[in-house]
Amino acid sequence: MNPLLGFILIILPIALALVLLVYFKKAADTTGVVVWIVTVLIAIFAFQTDIGVAIIASLAGIVRSFPISLMVATSILMMTYMQETGALQRLIVFFKTLGGGSRPMQILIISFGLGLFLVGIGATPVSMLPPVMLALGFSPLVSVALPSIGYDPLTTYALLGVPAQVFTDVYSGVSGSVIDLWFAGSVFASFMPVVSVGIAIAMLWIAGGKKLLFNREGLFIAIIAGVTAGITAIICNLEVVNLTRLTNVIAGAVVLGVLFVYNKVSKKPFMDRAQLDENDLNSEKALSLWRASIPWVILVFLSLLTTLVEPIRNFLANTLDIVINFGQYQTADFTVRSLSISTKFLWQAYTLMLIATLISMPFFKNDRKVLKNTYSKFIKRAPRPVLAAAIFFAMAEVMNFSGFIPDISGVWIFPTDPTNNMVYLLASITSAALGTAYPLTAAFLGLLAGFISGSETSAIAMFTNYHYQASMTIGANSIIVAASNGIGGGLASVLSPAKIQNAAAVIDQIGIEGDVIRYGLVVAVLMTFATALMTLLWAFPLSLYTIGLVFAAIIVVSLIGGIISWMRRPTSQ
C-alpha cells in the first residue's frame, strides 16, 4: 500500500463522519452505520482484507461494545421506569433546592457534584438537569451547556466505570499482557486533578463570564470542588481501595459533602426551597425522597457487593464468565493469539442496573399503564443510542484486522506487507513524522473520536491499538498515551451533538446547539491541550528535551491565541 494513499483512505471515514454530523446534521447512529460500511469496503478492496475476516471482526466489535451498549439500554430502562413512577420528578424537585441561592454554589453543587454522581450511576444529566437549571433562572444556553460539560470531569468512570473497564479489556488485548481494572483507573486518575479543576472553573465562565470567573468565592470553591474530585479519583483507584467502578459515585458524594461543610463553616444555607412551585410541592407529597431514591441505592449497594466482596466478585466475574471465541489471529511478531472476548456478563454494570430496576419495582405503583408506558418508551428510545454505541466498536475492529487473511487452518494471518494494516500504517506514518512529539496528538485524536461517536468508550475502542503501536515505535509509555486518548474522548462530551440535542430538547430549545458547541469548543480544546502537555511529560523519562517541547507547545498556542484575539478586537471609530 502506498503510504500517502493509505493515509488518505484511513482518514476518509473519519472525515466523512464529520461531514455527516456537522454539515448534514445526521444522527450518530446513522453516521456510524455509513462510516462502518465505508470502512469495511476500504478494508476489503484497498487493504486486501478477507471479507469473512471483516464480517467476523465487526461482530467481535459489537460483542466488545456490550459494556457500553447494553449499559446504555439498561440505564434508559431504569430512567424511563423512574420517570413513569414519578421517582425521577421527585428527585429533580430535591435537586432544585440545592445551592442556597448562591450562583457559584448552585453551579458546582448541581452541575458538578451532582453531575458526577448521576453520570456514575448511569443517569443522564443532560436529561435531568436542564429543567432544574432553567427553573433556577439560568439562560437556556447555560441550562444546556452546564449539564453537557458535567459529563467531563471524571467521564472515564461513568456508568459504573464502563469506559475504564473497556480500556482495560482493549489495552490488555492489544498489548498481550493483562492489566487490572484498578491499575487502568489509576492511570486515568493521574490526569483528573488538573482536568476536574479546569472543568469546574469553566462552568463558572460559561454561566457568568468574567463576572463569575473572577468572583473570589466562586473561584475558590471551584478549585476546592475540582481538587476534591481529582484526589478522590486517585484514592478510589489505589490497589488497596479498588473502587474503580464507584469512582464517580464516591467523588460526587464527597464533593457534595465538602461543599456542604464549606457552607456550614461559612454559615450559609445549603438548601433553598424558594425555587419550588405548586407542581414541585405536589410531587413532594406524592412520593417521599427515600422511596424515589431506592433504585439508585440498590444499584450502589450491588456495585459495592460485587466489587468489594471477593468471593462474590470472583464467582460472578470468573466462575460464571461467558467467553465468546471468534477464532485465532497472528500478530506482527508471528505470535498466534485467540480472539476471545470475556463478557463477565453477570458481573457487568448493565446486569446490576437491570437487577436494581427489577428489585425496586415493589416499592412503586406498578399498574398496567406504568408498565405499558415504560415498555413503549423504552422500545422507542433505546435502539438508536445502543446502535450508535456499538457500531464504532465494529469499525475499530475492522481497522485492527484490516489486511488479515485466513490460512488453511483458519488462523488470520498478519499481512505480508504490513502497510496493508490500517493501524500499522497510521502508527508508522505519524510516529515517523512527529517522533517524540507524537504523544501530543493522542488527546486531540480522542477529542475527535469522542465528537464523532459521542462516547469516550468508542474513542478508546477506535484508537487504543493505534496509540499502542505508535508508542512502542518511539519508546513512549503506551498506557499513558492510550489513556490520554480516552481523556480527550471524555472531554468531547461538551461537543457531542447527541448529548447537546438531548439537553436542548428537554427544555424545548432545539436550535441552540450551535451556540452551545461554540462555548464548549473553547473549554474542550484548552483542557485537551493541558492533557496533551501532561501526556508528553509523562510518556518519557523527564528530560530537558521533553520540558523544552512542552514550553514550545505552550508558546506556539499562546501566540496563536494572541493573534486570534488581536484580529477579533473591535476597531476604533
Say what each PLM segment does.
Residues M1-L77, R90, F94, L98, ...:
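Hydrophobic transmembrane alpha-helices of multi-pass solute/ion transporters
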Residues I10-Y23, V35-A46, V72-M79, G115, ...:
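Hydrophobic core segments of alpha-helical transmembrane domains in multi-pass membrane transport
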Residues F24, T156-L276, I487-Q573:
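Juxtamembrane and boundary regions of transmembrane helices in multi-pass small-molecule transporters
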Residues T31-T39, R64, V72, I107, ...:
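Alpha-helical transmembrane segments of multi-pass membrane proteins, especially transporters
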Residues F47-I55, A87, G120-I121, G161-L181, ...:
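Transmembrane helix-loop junctions in multi-pass membrane proteins
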Residues A54-S139, N366-A470:
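Membrane-embedded alpha-helical segments and adjacent helix-loop junctions characteristic
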Residues K96-L98, S102-R216, S428, L434-A437, ...:
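Hydrophobic transmembrane alpha-helices that form the pore/transport pathway of multi-pass ion
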Residues N263-W290, T319-S338, R569-Q573:
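Intrinsically disordered, low-complexity non-transmembrane regions of multi-pass membrane transporters
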